[in-house]
């Protein structure tokens, strides 16, 4: 899945809550340690030994005319509710199968003050698991600018919230102990009613129980009355992803129609770059 990982891990900009257009005046880059497998990847791909301790550094370059502050946070990769691998959450709810969250292997987040037209380096200590592990530990450094200028904030007095221009970068980190791959395994867990984009929906929790990510997922879900062949609701999505040892709720829109009382069955077919699965559950 290196093509997918390369796409995910190359430092990129995320515009969260745009109030007005603004030029990005900083960039980030990795400093590769000796155990980097390939220095042309654009992300950290580190082969580690049990109990290994090392430093991992991130360079922040300020290309602007003003000083700035950035937060650099080592976050664990999860799967968000859009079916995308997400590195931006500092305190997510971890899947029960995740044995080694990346965040817990790294020293805490740092705040850097970077003078105008200068660079600064954030250095973190990585403590690899003392025991051997299979597959991949996935995380990333989430770098976001700290905004001090209140002029750049738009305050919504009715809701009591503020919107601020914030541009963020992600530098991915992949930890492995061997070249042996672990095949992902998908499981269908709870089925429950909920909301999807403000509409009533059925939410089906899909779990990846193994230490390997999945990309290029095509998900085709159908709901029927239990024991019947007529499809009542159908949902299909492409280009979804799942982080190692993670889960998310896949939603099937009910078009704001109530689901009548009774027994139903859901079948979810998943095709991906790591395999195929057919999941089924009565509810």
What do the PLM-derived regions correspond to, one by one?
Residues 8-18:
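C-terminal segment of classical bacterial N-terminal signal peptides
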Residues 51-57, 120-122, 134-140, 198-202:
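Short, solvent-exposed loop/turn segments enriched in Ser/Thr/Gly
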Residues 91-132, 224-260:
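Intrinsically disordered, low-complexity Pro/Gly/Ser/Thr-rich segments with frequent PxxP/GP/PP motifs
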Residues 179-283:
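Membrane-proximal extracellular "stem/stalk" segments
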């Amino acid at each position: 899945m290196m093509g997918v990982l390369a796409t995910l891990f190359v430092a990129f900009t995320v515009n969260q809550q745009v109030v007005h257009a603004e030029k990005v005046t900083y960039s980030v880059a990795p400093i590769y340690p000796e155990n980097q497998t390939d220095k042309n990847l654009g992300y950290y791909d580190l082969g580690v030994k049990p109990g290994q301790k090392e430093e991992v550094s991130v360079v922040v370059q300020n290309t602007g005319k003003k000083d700035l502050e950035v937060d650099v946070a080592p976050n664990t990769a999860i799967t968000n509710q859009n079916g995308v691998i997400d590195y931006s959450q500092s305190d997510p709810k971890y899947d029960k199968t995740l044995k080694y969250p990346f965040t817990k292997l790294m020293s805490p987040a740092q705040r850097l003050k970077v003078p105008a037209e200068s660079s600064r380096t954030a250095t973190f200590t990585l403590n690899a698991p003392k025991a051997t592990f299979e597959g991949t530990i996935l995380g990333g450094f989430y770098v976001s600018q700290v905004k001090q200028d209140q002029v750049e904030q738009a305050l919504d007095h009715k809701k009591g919230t503020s919107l601020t221009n914030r541009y963020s970068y992600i530098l991915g980190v992949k930890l492995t102990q061997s070249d042996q791959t672990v095949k992902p395994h998908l499981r269908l867990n709870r089925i429950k009613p909920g909301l999807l984009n403000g509409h009533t929906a059925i939410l089906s929790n899909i779990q990846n129980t193994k230490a390997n990510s999945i990309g290029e997922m095509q998900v085709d879900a159908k709901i029927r009355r239990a024991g019947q062949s007529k499809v009542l609701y159908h949902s299909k999505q492409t280009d979804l992803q799942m982080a190692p040892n993670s889960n998310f709720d896949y939603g099937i829109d009910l078009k704001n129609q109530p689901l009548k009382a009774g027994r139903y069955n859901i079948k979810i077919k998943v095709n991906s770059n790591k395999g195929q699965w057919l999941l089924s559950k009565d509810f």
